[in-house]
């Protein structure tokens, strides 16, 4: 991926992008996905198998919307940690959580997906939503998520993917490559962040390759579910 100046790394570039759009991120996600993002997050959370009283981790949690879904499953006796490296996204996440019944069971932590600040076998599950494209090292991120999950627990990724259905694929890529950057520019008031979105998907591995990465990092029963015609894919693996 081309990193524009003055940024020196993908990590620095991604941090700047999400800092600039945190205030409009949730609204634009819902608008650009035609309100499907809520269903996608709920489906991904359900794949974790998180039970009432359980403990979950949401990596690259952003504004906390998937974190909230995990807290809903964990219930009043559970605990969920949302981790992100972007301060402004975490601030928005705290604001979002304060409007839910789950503020007492969610904690936000600033940290990096490739070096999670938790001991081995800490959580019952770990999720990452719409962020595996953005990390500097996909394999390391999956490996870190697996490390902090207890044996038998699930690692789940919800991510944009590459649809393959004829005709639908062409329509989708026209929308994604041309209209999303335009609508994003109108939504945030400046160019850049939503032009990054289609570029990030071009460089991202196909869903079958991500499944293989899950296997190579030691996750058992690695599988994936394509949703909404393959616009997004949920990958699931079990820690052994």
Annotate each language-model stretch with its function.
Residues 12-13, 158-213, 217, 223:
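C-terminal alpha-helical "lid/dimerization" subdomain adjacent to the S-adenosyl-L-methionine
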Residues 25, 126-127:
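Hydrophobic beta-strand segment of the Class I
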Residues 34-54, 69:
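Conserved alpha-helix/loop element of class I SAM-dependent methyltransferases that forms part
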Residues 52-53, 76-77, 149-154:
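Short glycine-dipeptide loop
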Residues 55-115:
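Class I SAM-dependent methyltransferase SAM/SAH-binding core
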Residues 114-125:
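A short acidic, Gly/Pro-enriched loop at the edge of an enzyme's catalytic core
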Residues 139-151:
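A short glycine-rich, Lys/Arg-flanked "PGG" loop and its adjoining helix->strand segment in the class I
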Residues 217-240:
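Core SAM-dependent methyltransferase catalytic element
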């Amino acid at each position: 991926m081309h990193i524009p100046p003055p940024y020196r790394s993908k990590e620095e570039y991604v941090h700047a992008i999400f800092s600039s759009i945190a205030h409009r991120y949730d609204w634009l996600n819902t608008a650009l996905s035609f309100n499907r993002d809520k269903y996608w997050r709920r489906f991904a959370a359900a794949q974790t198998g998180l039970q009432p009283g359980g403990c979950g981790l949401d990596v690259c949690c952003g504004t906390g919307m998937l974190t909230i879904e995990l807290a809903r499953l964990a219930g009043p006796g559970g605990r969920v940690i949302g981790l992100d490296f972007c301060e402004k996204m975490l601030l928005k996440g705290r604001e979002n959580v304060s409007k839910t019944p789950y503020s007492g069971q969610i904690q936000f932590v600033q940290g990096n997906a490739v070096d999670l600040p938790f001991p081995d076998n800490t959580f019952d599950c770990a999720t990452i939503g719409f962020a595996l494209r953005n990390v500097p090292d996909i394999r390391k991120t999956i490996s870190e998520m697996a490390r902090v999950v207890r044996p038998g627990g699930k690692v789940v990724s919800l991510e944009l993917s590459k649809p393959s259905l004829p005709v639908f694929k062409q329509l989708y890529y026209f929308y994604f490559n041309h209209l999303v950057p335009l609508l994003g520019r109108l939504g945030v008031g400046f160019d850049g962040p939503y032009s990054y979105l289609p570029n990030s998907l071009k460089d991202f591995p196909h869903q079958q390759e991500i499944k293989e990465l899950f296997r190579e990092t030691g996750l058992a029963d690695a599988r994936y579910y394509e949703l909404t015609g393959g616009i997004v894919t949920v990958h699931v693996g079990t820690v052994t």
